[in-house]
């Protein structure tokens, strides 16, 4: 947010400074303030982008190499940048929460995921699933309601939300939720299939979402699919320890 405040202050100073110096009137002062803000924001964004992109690329390489602790530290080191770049902190906390969860640090994961941006659909879905498994259905549905409102075309989010509603015998609400999603994405096959299943009073299936679904821990995968715990996209799983 510092960036917005700084750009606004600079733009207003330049725009209305000209008015005070009698260079232009009120209308031009407002116009030039907007122009100065846009120019300042572009310059600022370019500067921070040149720092952020290499840092994120380094984190990706660390995760692909299975260097989980190092990747977590790199993400933590970027948190101060969240004071300057809007929404960045929430995205970083989302990545850190996913990383902590798939590293087996559940308590730390929940703490981080609570601070994740509502637009980080995968992180918010995971947090809701953890609460649901812990029996806190109210909190789970609060998280899902907001996440679904923000991520309106996230098929797995909507289907998982409906699955949990159906699980607690709120099938009518589950149908209404999927119907709402199908208005935006009428050709989504997994959603159409689950909608039909709900209408026929049969069990929903999430197999179409493959390991992304099973990694949430609400259902066990078929034995043919192997071990359930998987890292997020772009992550490598930590090596198995010998003797276990």
Residues covered by each model-derived region:
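Helical anchoring/docking segments at protein termini
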Residues: 1-51, 223-244
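N-terminal topogenic membrane-targeting module
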Residues: 25-28, 36-107, 111-114
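Alpha-helical linker/edge segments of TPR/alpha-solenoid repeat scaffolds
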Residues: 50, 67, 97-108, 135-143, ...
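Alpha-helical adaptor scaffolds
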Residues: 82, 86-163
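Solenoid-like repeat scaffolds
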Residues: 42-47, 77-85, 113-120, 146-152, ...
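Terminal, low-structured helical/coil segments at or just beyond the last alpha-helical repeat
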Residues: 9-11, 181-244
């Amino acid at each position: 947010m510092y960036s917005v405040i700084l750009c606004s202050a600079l733009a207003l100073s330049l725009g209305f400074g000209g008015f005070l110096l009698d260079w232009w009137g009120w209308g031009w002062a407002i116009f030039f303030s907007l122009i100065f803000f846009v120019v300042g924001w572009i310059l600022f964004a370019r500067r921070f982008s040149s720092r952020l992109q290499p840092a994120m690329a380094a984190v990706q390489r660390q995760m692909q190499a299975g260097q989980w602790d190092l990747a977590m530290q790199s993400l933590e080191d970027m948190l101060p940048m969240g004071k300057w770049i809007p929404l960045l902190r929430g995205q970083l906390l989302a990545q850190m929460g996913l990383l902590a969860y798939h590293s087996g640090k559940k308590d730390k994961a929940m703490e981080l995921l609570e601070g994740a941006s509502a637009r980080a659909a995968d992180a918010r879905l995971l947090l809701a699933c953890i609460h649901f498994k812990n029996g806190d259905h109210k909190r789970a549905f609060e998280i899902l309601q907001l996440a679904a409102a923000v991520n309106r075309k996230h098929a797995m989010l909507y289907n998982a939300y409906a699955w949990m509603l159906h699980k607690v015998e709120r099938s009518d609400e589950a149908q209404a939720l999927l119907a709402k999603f199908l208005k935006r994405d009428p050709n989504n096959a997994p959603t159409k299939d689950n909608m039909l299943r709900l209408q026929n009073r049969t069990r929903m299936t999430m197999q179409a979402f493959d390991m992304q679904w099973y990694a949430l821990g609400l259902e066990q995968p078929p034995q043919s699919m192997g071990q359930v715990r998987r890292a997020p996209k772009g992550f490598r799983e930590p090596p198995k320890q010998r003797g276990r």
